[in-house]
Amino acid sequence: MPIAFTRCGSALHRVVARSAYSPCAARSYSSYVFQENDIVLVQKKTDSSAKQILSKPLRPGKRVNTSSGHIDHESIIGLSPRAIVSTATGKGEYRIYRPTLGEYANLTARIVTPVYPADANLIVSLLDLNPTVPDPSSSLPSPPLEIFEAGTGHGALTLHLARAIHAANPAPPPIPSRARPALAPDSEEGTSDAVEAEYQAAVDKWEAYKPTRRAVVTTLDISARHSAHAKTVIAGWRRGMYAHSVDFHVGSIPEYIASRLATSPEPFLDHTILDLPDCHLYLETISQAMKEDGTMLVFCPSITQVIACLKQARKEGLPLVLESTLEIGQAAGVGGKLWDVRAVRARSFVRAEAAEAEKAEGGEEGVESGTEGSEADVVAETTPKEAEPLKPESDGWNMVCRPKVGDRVVGGGFVGVFRRVVK
């Protein structure tokens, strides 16, 4: 580092001239460089509003296709985020980024519509997840925090859930790949045995690791194709950063819950998210597997489906209470639009029912005074949390369904927040 001395009067001062190319001056914001198997975001250097391109995992010999020509993966590997790279033809310059989780979820190839980042973040926040870090000094194993997602779909919501809990788990071993390395035709049998032994050792390590997890997302889909696609989406994010916190299953909800309860009759689910048609048909099955005070979210495209869940829960006398209903989507705001969904009975019906009860007991006096006052008000103003179990609809129950404030706006769907309570 160059050092110069200047004299001011009788004092000699040392002046340090830092070179523009010294390590400290040239230090970038991040020392990270892109490596093989990373996924990058590519965008035109001169147009921040241009379409973003999500690359495939970086590998030698592969390329990113753009409107100005292709970019070889080799020219990206070794560069830092926000670096500029030219196309092979030299006709265009592009800036490369590390994609955010939301950008990755939006831009990955899809076979079903994903849950968009704003909605996924809101849904995760409604669960109020607070997983604890592993305690190496504890010798007593505790049951893990388990979130059940019915309807894996694209895997975007699964990815957001896994991000919220993955820090509670110890560092995982490499997840064994189902695709075993292909052997050359002239390979020896001993080589094949070695590959098989290595693969089996990786499987054994992974199976030994799974019981040590303190938080897990169990995701189920009826379609094997959707589940397999979601698995690749999870594995592609930062080289499978959250893959160890997710268990994928294919099948129906009744079959899966029944198989789990057959091995252990105790409730095992802390929270549940239902993102599938006819959610109300599965409430009874899932409530048997949910722990007390757990949260069940039903994510539906229409408000009538949330109403169907509320009616089903009360009709069957299930230990589920509807705490709130939110409309989500870009038009509803970041925090969701609150809806008032509850079951009520008209005061006139309550008075008539009370009169019938008095007649059955042989007296009719005091009916009006007994029902006109506080009792009728309490019934009419009952909140979802305080409501008694709903009797059949012939008993006079009706649904209140309206936005809490203002008029209804078109949104991306509705979330009903149910709480598992003591029966």
Please give the residue ranges for each predicted region.
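S-adenosyl-L-methionine
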Residues: L183-L274, G335-K337
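Helix N-cap at the beta1-alpha1 junction of Rossmann-like dinucleotide-binding domains, i.e.
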Residues: S177-A179, A224-S227, I303
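Intrinsically disordered, low-complexity glycine/charged-rich regulatory or linker segments
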Residues: M1-V115, L129-N130, G363, E375-K423
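Glycine-rich SAM-binding Motif I of class I
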Residues: G155-L159, H280
